[in-house]
C-alpha cells in the first residue's frame, strides 16, 4: 500500500480485490502465491491507516461461497489438496456455468454490498 500511496495522485483511486477469511487459507493459496486473507474490516483498517478513504467495500464470490467453504473444510480434514490447487483448466461448459454467479453478483453489487464471500473488494481514494 505504501507504493500505491506514493505513485497515486492526490484523490487517485485504488481498487483492491483480495482473498477473504484466514480460515479459508489452503494449499491453493500457496500455489497461487497468496500470502494473506482479510476480513472486510481488517482490509478497511489497513486502507485507512495508509492514507486512503474507502468509497465502497464489500465481499464478493458470495453465491459460490458455501461450495468453496465446504470444499476447503473437507480438503483440510482429509488433507486432500496437498497435490493440486484449484487453479486448473476447467471444461468450457462448466466454466460458463460457474461464470453465471459472477454475472449475477456484478449486477447486485451495483446497488448493494454483499455480507460475506471468498473475496473482499474495496474501492478507495487517496487523501
Q: Predicted regions span which residues?
A:
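A short glycine-rich, Lys/Arg-flanked "PGG" loop and its adjoining helix->strand segment in the class I
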Residues: 1-13
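Short secondary-structure boundary/capping segments
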Residues: 6, 23, 112-114
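Short, glycine-/aromatic-enriched active-site segment of Class I SAM-dependent methyltransferases
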Residues: 14-36, 40-46
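Short catalytic/ligand-binding loop motif for oxyanion handling, primarily in non-cytosolic enzymes
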Residues: 23-26, 63-67
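A structural motif corresponding to the C-terminal end of an alpha-helix
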Residues: 49-52, 126
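Conserved S-adenosyl-L-methionine
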Residues: 52-62
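A C-terminal cap/extension of S-adenosyl-L-methionine-dependent methyltransferases
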Residues: 64-127
Amino acid at each position: 500500500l505504501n507504493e500505491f500511496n506514493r505513485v497515486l495522485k492526490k484523490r487517485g483511486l485504488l481498487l483492491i480485490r483480495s482473498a477473504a477469511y484466514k480460515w479459508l487459507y489452503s494449499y491453493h493459496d500457496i500455489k497461487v502465491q497468496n500470502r494473506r486473507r482479510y476480513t472486510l474490516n481488517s482490509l478497511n483498517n489497513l486502507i485507512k491507516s495508509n492514507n486512503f478513504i474507502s468509497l465502497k467495500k464489500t465481499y464478493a464470490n458470495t453465491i459460490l461461497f458455501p461450495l468453496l467453504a465446504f470444499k476447503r473444510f473437507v480438503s483440510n480434514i482429509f488433507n486432500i489438496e496437498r497435490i493440486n490447487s484449484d487453479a486448473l483448466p476447467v471444461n468450457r461448459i462448466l466454466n460458463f456455468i460457474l461464470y453465471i454467479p459472477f454475472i449475477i453478483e456484478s449486477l447486485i453489487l451495483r446497488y448493494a454490498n454483499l455480507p460475506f464471500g471468498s473475496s473482499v473488494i474495496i474501492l478507495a481514494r487517496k487523501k
